[in-house]
């Protein structure tokens, strides 16, 4: 059987040349990273306080 391979170029557009776009993207990425870290910390706190109930609820919802 013949297989086709396609290559996609990386987003190359006019936005690559704008330094402001890169700085804004970096700022957004840092904010999202901070929000994700905060959410993971909150999950860790819940698990530390009540891991048994968390696991029980997870299994009841179909988790393994």
Curated annotation (Swiss-Prot):
Entry superkingdom: Bacteria
This protein's record includes keyword NAD: no
Keyword Coiled coil applies: yes
Positions carrying Deamidated glutamine: 64
Pfam families: Pup
Example GO BP: proteasomal protein catabolic process
Record's comment on post-translational modification: Is modified by deamidation of its C-terminal glutamine to glutamate probably by the deamidase Dop, a prerequisite to the subsequent pupylation process.
Region of interest (Disordered), residue spans: 1-42
Keywords: Coiled coil, Isopeptide bond, Ubl conjugation pathway
Sections of the chain in a coiled coil: 23-52
Functional pathway: Protein degradation; proteasomal Pup-dependent pathway
UniProt region (ARC ATPase binding), positions on chain: 21-58
Cross-link (Isoglutamyl lysine isopeptide (Gln-Lys) (interchain with K-? in acceptor proteins)): 64
Family to which this protein belongs: Belongs to the prokaryotic ubiquitin-like protein family.
Oligomeric and partner information: Strongly interacts with the proteasome-associated ATPase ARC through a hydrophobic interface; the interacting region of Pup lies in its C-terminal half. There is one Pup binding site per ARC hexamer ring.
UniProt domain comment: The N-terminal unstructured half of Pup provides a signal required to initiate unfolding and degradation by the proteasome but is not needed for pupylation, while the C-terminal helical half of Pup interacts with ARC to target proteins to the proteasome.
Function comment: Protein modifier that is covalently attached to lysine residues of substrate proteins, thereby targeting them for proteasomal degradation. The tagging system is termed pupylation. Among the identified substrates are the SodA and Ino1 proteins.
Protein name as annotated: Prokaryotic ubiquitin-like protein Pup
Encoding gene, per UniProt annotation: pup
